Regions:
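Interaction-mediating elements
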Residues: 1-129
Length: 129
């Protein structure tokens, strides 16, 4: 029978997580009930997700740790990329958005940005005084 699996992340900021998902071309829906159906349509399981990117994939806040978790039905995963790659892409975009927001708050402006062969990101920032 299908069921939801929970994968821990280090993502804490909901607006940045939502922006990262949208930049990755996901249609993000807020406060959705995710649902999986058992074999042959018998039984089902539901879980609440603060940010959903499908009917059975989303992110929910762990109230104890204050960190978002990926919840998904890994048994019937039918995305174009493996779940590990999805998390890598989300983490990279989340980090990019966090850096952009931080440098902006510090009065800097991103002038150039490169994605390196190893998937790291390099930025050139400036600040006029």
């Amino acid at each position: 029978m299908s069921h939801f699996s929970t994968i821990k992340t280090k993502l804490k900021n909901k607006p940045i997580l939502q922006e990262a998902l949208e930049l990755l071309q996901y249609d993000v829906k807020q406060d959705q009930e995710l649902k999986v159906t058992g074999a042959h349509g018998i039984g089902h399981e539901t879980v609440e997700a603060e940010l959903a990117i499908g009917t059975d994939i989303g992110f929910r806040l762990n109230e104890i740790t204050g960190v978002y978790e990926l919840v998904a039905d890994l048994e019937t995963w039918n995305q174009p990329i493996p779940v590990e790659r999805l998390l890598d892409k989300v983490n990279q975009q989340y980090a990019r958005m966090t850096i952009h927001n931080t440098v902006k708050k510090m009065g800097f402006q991103v002038e150039e940005e490169w994605e390196m062969d190893d998937n790291s990101i390099e930025l050139t920032v400036t600040r006029w005084t």
